[in-house]
Amino acid sequence: MDPDPDHNHRPNFPLQLLDSSTSSSSTSLAIISTTSEPNSEPKKPPPKRTSTKDRHTKVEGRGRRIRMPAMCAARVFQLTRELGHKSDGETIEWLLQQAEPAVIAATGTGTIPANFTSLNISLRSSRSSLSAAHLRTTPSSYYFHSPHQSMTHHLQHQHQVRPKNESHSSSSSSSQLLDHNQMGNYLVQSTAGSLPTSQSPATAPFWSSGDNTQNLWAFNINPHHSGVVAGDVYNPNSGGSGGGSGVHLMNFAAPIALFSGQPLASGYGGGGGGGGEHSHYGVLAALNAAYRPVAETGNHNNNQQNRDGDHHHNHQEDGSTSHHS
């Protein structure tokens, strides 16, 4: 059997395929090696940009990033650590709360949303300033009402509320109320202080004292001089040396102005030691003498109203009897 003459010349296809595959892999390795060579070289750092502007630091605050000078940012960071805040934005909000009154004074508007938690400080300060301004501008405040004005208002209100048949009883009670309220409104003050001139009622001069062994009491009722009288109280036992305690000041209301025409004390200004031997009136005696005409006037008005009421009642009875007859 003869071998096939084309058997030796038949191409071996699997071997050729293997050769081609190995050659392709070698070429791919060569490509990879050539591409990796440039990456191995170190990259040069970019040159630093030099700017003439001031350096700023970004600080987190209120949902966005803001820019501020480096000194301010350093202070904010320090305050965040000292106050124990969780973030720098909380520190900035705290700073705005502290500066809110100054911001409102400078711009007229606030920088923080209007809620009570953030505006507590500014609301408190503005409320106190408004109340102080109101007290300064009010002509007659709560603490400086004149006793005469308050009693007049009280009597008018009482007269409007009560019926007409109780007018005679209300007049007597109102006169008693007037006496008690005016006596309660007298302010006995020492040399420590006194009311301002604009708030003291218009009064007249009045001096009085007790017996010869007591110091002289000075009651300042002069509308032109409402301060404390300078110097010491006159002491009769000191022989004109000027010893004794401080001046006791009493501000009387307007009804005491009737004292200005009465010679209550004649020896209060004596230079010698015998000045206290002259006629001196006690404080209680002077006050009783002052208010006795007021009480008599009230009783006289009460009796007059009772007589008028009885006359009117008798006139009505006479008219009714004549009508029945």
Swiss-Prot record:
Domain TCP: 52-106
Composition skew (Basic and acidic residues), residue ranges: 51-63, 307-325
One term of GO molecular function: transcription cis-regulatory region binding
Coiled coil: none
GO terms of biological process kind: cell division; circadian rhythm; DNA endoreduplication; gynoecium development; inflorescence development; regulation of anthocyanin biosynthetic process; regulation of DNA-templated transcription; response to cytokinin
Keywords linked to the UniProt accession: Developmental protein, DNA-binding, Nucleus, Transcription, Transcription regulation
Other notes: Plants overexpressing TCP14 exhibit altered plant development and occasionally are lethal.
PANTHER family documented for this protein: TRANSCRIPTION FACTOR TCP15-RELATED, TRANSCRIPTION FACTOR TCP4-RELATED
This protein's name: Transcription factor TCP15
Origin organism lineage: Eukaryota, Viridiplantae, Streptophyta, Embryophyta, Tracheophyta
